[in-house]
């Protein structure tokens, strides 16, 4: 169960979010966040991910996320921003394997099973032929699909996704939403998502907030 209690975010002298409350009782749900541009959807995701100072509390299975160490938070919450922030040369497979980092020790290499899972995830999103291609040379849509594949290899029970469809064409947006919904339902994870195309949320999300 995931709960947000009295969450508020203030940046400078401006209240961005105030008194946000909601509970997701059942795991395995894709929950869409509705709101006009500038209403604080990204701010909400960043606050839950621990990237913005806030008041109130976010609880995963009764445990306050605010009480977790950086490593434990990374093992509990997976945040996918609008822009990946990756600016160094890495293969698509290496980018996907970054999703395994919270489970690895210092200087520990990914296991064979992790590597196999990464390649399977790339196949699932239609990038099997891009496995060794430099991530920076992929198109914008291919980059977003690569990041979606990274999500598929992560173990975090809570997924936060901020417009993972923004660089995709209409057909690939629908395909991405279908893949994500199937993954969330099968894995039992809880996913909060903002989508560039709000109609996709009506089609694929289990509930809206």
Language model features by range: what are they?
Residues 34-36:
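The feature captures the beta-strand-to-loop junction immediately N-terminal to the Walker
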Residues 49:
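Helix-to-loop junction immediately C-terminal to a conserved catalytic motif
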Residues 56-64, 73:
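Conserved ABC transporter NBD signature motif
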Residues 97, 112-130:
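Conserved ABC ATPase "signature" region
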Residues 134-138, 142:
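Conserved ABC ATPase signature
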Residues 159-163:
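Catalytic Walker B motif of ABC-type/P-loop ATPase nucleotide-binding domains
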Residues 195-196:
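H-loop/switch region of ABC-family ATPase nucleotide-binding domains
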């Amino acid at each position: 169960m995931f709960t947000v209690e009295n969450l508020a975010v203030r940046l400078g002298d401006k209240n961005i979010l105030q008194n946000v409350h909601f509970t997701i009782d059942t795991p395995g749900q894709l929950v869409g966040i509705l709101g006009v541009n500038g209403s604080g959807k990204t701010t909400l995701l960043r606050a839950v991910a621990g990237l913005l100072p806030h008041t109130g509390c976010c609880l995963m299975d009764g445990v306050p996320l605010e009480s977790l160490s950086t490593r434990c938070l990374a093992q509990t919450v997976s945040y996918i921003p609008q822009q990946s922030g990756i600016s160094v040369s890495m293969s698509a497979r290496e980018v996907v394997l970054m999703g395994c980092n919270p489970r690895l020790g210092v200087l520990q290499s990914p296991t064979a099973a992790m590597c196999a899972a990464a390649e399977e995830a790339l196949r699932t999103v239609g990038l099997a032929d891009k496995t060794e291609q430099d991530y920076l040379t992929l198109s914008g849509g291919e980059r977003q699909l690569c990041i979606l594949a990274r999500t598929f290899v992560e173990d975090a029970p809570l997924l936060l996704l901020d417009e993972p469809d923004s660089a995709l064409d209409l057909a690939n947006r629908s395909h991405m939403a279908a893949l994500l919904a199937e993954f969330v339902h099968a894995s039992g994870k809880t996913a909060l998502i903002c989508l560039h195309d709000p109609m996709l949320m009506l089609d694929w999300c289990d509930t809206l907030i």
